[in-house]
Swiss-Prot record:
Recorded GO CC terms: extracellular region
Keyword Disulfide bond: yes
Family designation: Belongs to the peptidase S1 family.
Principal place of residence: secreted
Keywords, comma-separated and alphabetical: Allergen, Disulfide bond, Hydrolase, Protease, Secreted, Serine protease, Signal, Zymogen
Organism: Dermatophagoides pteronyssinus
Active site feature: H69, D114, S214
Gene: DERP3
EC number: 3.4.21.-
Domain Peptidase S1: 30-260
Site keyed Required for specificity: positions: D208
Cystine pairings recorded for this chain: C54-C70, C181-C198, C210-C236
Protein name in the entry: Mite allergen Der p 3
Leading EC class: hydrolase
Family annotation (Pfam families): Trypsin
Amino acid sequence: MIIYNILIVLLLAINTLANPILPASPNATIVGGEKALAGECPYQISLQSSSHFCGGTILDEYWILTAAHCVAGQTASKLSIRYNSLKHSLGGEKISVAKIFAHEKYDSYQIDNDIALIKLKSPMKLNQKNAKAVGLPAKGSDVKVGDQVRVSGWGYLEEGSYSLPSELRRVDIAVVSRKECNELYSKANAEVTDNMICGGDVANGGKDSCQGDSGGPVVDVKNNQVVGIVSWGYGCARKGYPGVYTRVGNFIDWIESKRSQ
C-alpha cells in the first residue's frame, strides 16, 4: 500500500502524495488482523527481489496479479515469487519471473489503473493446501457496500513500523462506498476513481493493509474471487481513512488480453 505522509500532504499536496514508498516497502502489512492459518489464503504469493517487497495473487499456474506500482521500474529477470508458504522468507517454492505487464494507463500521480500481471518462467504446482488459484469477478462487477472482504499480506503491523512479520496475516474488512471514500479523501486532496474500491472501519480505524502488503489480494471469500488489489491509503488503519484498492472487475478484458499473449 502506498502511504501518504501528513506533512507532505500539507506542504506539497497531491503530486508528492502519489509517490509510493519504494522497495523494499511499497506494500503495506496487515493492521488489526491475525495470523493466517494453513489453507486460508492459498492464492497469496510473495513478490521478491533480494527479499519480499510486494504481494500478489495466483490466477493460474503461470499468472500472478499484482499492483502496477509494485513493478514500476522493475526488471523481470531480477524478480521471483515464493508460493505455497505462510512465510515470505522460507518454505514453499520460488519461481523466477519471465515477463511483467503493467497497465499501459497506470497513473503514478493519481495511482489510477494500479494493476499489473506477472508471467512466470515455469508453472506453479497448484491444488495444494497453501497453493491454489482464485477466480476473477464478472466483467464490470463492483463490490457491495458493507460486504466483508479479506485482505492478506506480510506488511507492517502498524504505521511507522519497519519490521515485516515472518508469517502471513489476514484481516476481514467491510466495503465502504466510493462516494463516502471520496468525501473522506478530499480532505487529503486525493481522488478515489471508479477504478478503485475502499474498505475498512471508518468510524474506529484499526483494520487495514499497510506498508508491505501492496499488490496483494482483496478477496470475496464467499465466492472465491479476487475483487481488489492492495493499492494506496493515508497512513495505516487511521480513523476516517479506509484503505483504497484497485477494482479488479473493471480490468477483466485487460487481464484476459494479456493472459492470451
